[in-house]
């Protein structure tokens, strides 16, 4: 046998035992959904958790890895888990929103979510996608680059996951159920949370989260806003962040002392521990520039330099004012895609479907809603308040089950009016389970226009199954003649969750290259509950990898 053949056989045997560093892996996780007594704000309550942890466990993987996550439901509620921001290319069965892509996992039942992290790296997250269970059922999903592939920014010395949330002393299911009976808005949360801790609050001297750092080292903070209903500002006293990624997409780095992060969004920032030894206050506080009630309790934590005595005083900072629109706009307007050769911004430049969706609130008749004087607050897209079906939409589409949904969702508002101002006499909405159909690979431009019906408000809108580019935003009513002239088609930020500004509009573009049924909804949970949601039905293409895969055998049944 020649020396070349011996060497070849050695290499074959070597790589069969030691896989190449770039080879993707199959990673197995098990989520036991269980009740656990959790104490916060000096009171305890039975809480739905994953593996008895609040917040839930962080999932770690690498780009192109396959995840098999077995979810076992040990609680009295139906359960489903959404992997927020994961593209789920051809695997809509694993996306997770109950009654959209799957029937929920019933008590005592099991479902294994099986999907591949195709071409994605960065910080995403997971959460329950049924009822209000995501108040406590959530955690981070960290997707590292492939081995040997560096970050497109200076390598940090360490990484930390920071998940922001909200906490109610009362049972959240009772809170939303009572609100639905009354027709009014639910009670706001009792506190915000930083990695599951509020920090010391009035009448309850609890410990907050401590972020330990060493002088001179740089840390990558992976921020997630898992709050149900509130946009948040995030600050560290005396420190400046460098923003490097949002929604698992790299951005052109920029510096800021305040991060704005809406429910559903993720943001990666670099923090260099360049100050004198000490303890520095961390704040998570609400942003709301509309006359809407919010939880105004600021959650706090500390950045704790090594060698600092625990008795040392904490260096303080004031959070931004609740209505600090200019700070919010400065942050949002600084976001640009990296748009490098390795990470290009593939913005659609020709458009097949021009859509215009109004997003906002309304009032429908409710004779039993005594507190609401016979009316119920609802929410809608293009004046359609979405009604959840009794069975899941994706299986109904796949198996051609009739009578579950229609595909006549309006591409424009049924009534043209002064969306961002002026009074509206009829605030009623239509209801229905209506989808918008898109051919495979169609390009879409979608205008999301806030309305002032009842009150203007910032709506963080999340699209499942796709990333999209924000090509423009502004205040007032979108002008289809003037505003496109200012679109950014070169390096617009790429996201999966976008904030529609209060009293304004945002325009997104995406390519419908992922067949299936894909939910789009406001990520303020109260607005989703009220009906601010719809779904796109993306048809199969004609190529070999352009059709949705068959459903798994253990897909839950309704």
Curated annotation (Swiss-Prot):
Gene3D superfamilies noted in UniProt: Cupredoxins - blue copper proteins
GO molecular function terms attached to this record: copper ion binding; hydroquinone:oxygen oxidoreductase activity; oxidoreductase activity
GO biological process: lignin biosynthetic process; lignin catabolic process; plant-type secondary cell wall biogenesis
First-tier enzyme category under EC: oxidoreductase
The keyword Oxidoreductase appears for this protein: yes
Pfam families: Cu-oxidase, Cu-oxidase_2, Cu-oxidase_3
Binding residues for Cu cation 3: 129, 464, 521
Cited CDD domains: CuRO_1_LCC_plant, CuRO_2_LCC_plant, CuRO_3_LCC_plant
Signal peptide stretch: 1-24
A Gene Ontology cellular-component term: apoplast
Sites where the protein binds Cu cation 4: 459, 522, 527
Residues binding Cu cation 2, per UniProt: 84, 127, 523
Cofactor: Cu cation
Keyword Metal-binding: yes
Keywords: Apoplast, Copper, Glycoprotein, Lignin degradation, Metal-binding, Oxidoreductase, Repeat, Secreted, Signal
Plastocyanin-like domain location: 32-148, 158-308, 408-542
Subcellular location per the Swiss-Prot or TrEMBL entry: Secreted, Extracellular space, Apoplast
Biological role stated in the UniProt entry: Lignin degradation and detoxification of lignin-derived products. Required for secondary xylem cell wall lignification.
UniProt-recorded name of the protein: Laccase-4
Lineage: Eukaryota, Viridiplantae, Streptophyta, Embryophyta, Tracheophyta
Gene name of the encoded protein: IRX12
């Amino acid at each position: 046998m020649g020396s070349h053949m011996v060497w070849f056989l050695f290499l074959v045997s070597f790589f069969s035992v030691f896989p190449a560093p770039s080879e993707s892996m199959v990673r197995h996780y098990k989520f036991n959904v269980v009740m656990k007594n959790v104490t916060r704000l000096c009171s305890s309550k039975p809480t739905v958790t994953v593996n008895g942890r609040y917040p839930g466990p962080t999932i770690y993987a690498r780009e192109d890895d396959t995840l098999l996550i077995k979810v076992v439901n040990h609680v009295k509620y139906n359960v489903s888990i959404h992997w927020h921001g994961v593209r789920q290319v051809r695997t809509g069965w694993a996306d997770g929103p109950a009654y959209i892509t799957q029937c929920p996992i019933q008590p005592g039942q099991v479902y294994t979510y099986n999907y591949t992290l195709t071409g994605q790296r960065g910080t995403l997250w997971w959460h329950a996608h049924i009822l209000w269970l995501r108040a406590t059922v959530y955690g981070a999903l960290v997707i590292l680059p492939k081995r040997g592939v560096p970050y497109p920014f200076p390598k940090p010395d360490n990484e930390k996951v920071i998940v922001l949330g909200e906490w109610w002393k009362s049972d959240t299911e009772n809170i939303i159920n009572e609100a639905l009976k009354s027709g009014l808005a639910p009670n706001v949360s009792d506190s915000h949370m930083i990695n599951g801790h509020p920090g010391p609050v009035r009448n309850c001297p609890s410990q907050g989260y401590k972020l330990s750092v060493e002088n001179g080292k740089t840390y990558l903070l992976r921020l997630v806003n898992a709050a149900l209903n509130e946009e948040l500002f995030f600050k560290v006293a005396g420190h400046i962040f460098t923003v490097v990624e949002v929604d698992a997409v790299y951005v052109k780095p920029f510096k800021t002392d305040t991060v704005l992060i809406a429910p559903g969004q993720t943001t990666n920032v670099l923090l260099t521990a360049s100050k004198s030894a000490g303890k520095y206050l961390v704040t998570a506080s609400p942003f709301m520039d509309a006359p809407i009630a919010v939880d105004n309790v600021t959650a706090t934590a500390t950045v704790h330099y090594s060698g600092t005595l625990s008795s040392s005083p904490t260096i303080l900072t004031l959070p931004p004012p609740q209505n600090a629109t200019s700070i919010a706009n400065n942050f949002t307007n600084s976001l640009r895609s990296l748009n490098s050769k390795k990470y290009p911004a593939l913005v659609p430049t020709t458009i097949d479907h021009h859509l215009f969706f109004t997003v906002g609130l309304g009032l429908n008749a409710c004779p039993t809603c005594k507190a609401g004087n016979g009316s119920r607050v609802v929410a809608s897209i293009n004046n359609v308040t979405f009604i959840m079906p009794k069975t899941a939409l994706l299986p109904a589409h796949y198996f051609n089950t009739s009578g579950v949904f229609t595909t006549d969702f309006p591409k424009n508002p049924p009534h043209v009016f002064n969306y961002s101002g002026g009074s509206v006499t009829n605030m009623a909405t239509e209801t229905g389970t209506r989808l918008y159909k898109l051919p495979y690979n169609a390009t879409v431009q979608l205008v999301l226009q806030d309305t002032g019906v009842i009150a203007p408000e910032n709506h963080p809108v999340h699209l499942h199954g796709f990333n999209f580019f924000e090509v423009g935003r502004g205040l007032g009513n979108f002008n289809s003649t003037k505003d496109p002239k200012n679109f950014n088609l070169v390096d617009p930020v790429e996201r999966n969750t976008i904030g529609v500004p209060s009293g304004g509009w945002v325009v997104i573009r995406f390519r419908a290259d992922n067949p299936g049924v894909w939910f789009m909804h406001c990520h303020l949970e109260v607005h989703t509950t009220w009906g601010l949601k719809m779904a796109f039905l993306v048809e199969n293409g004609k190529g070999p990898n352009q059709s949705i895969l068959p459903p798994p055998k253990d897909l839950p049944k309704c």
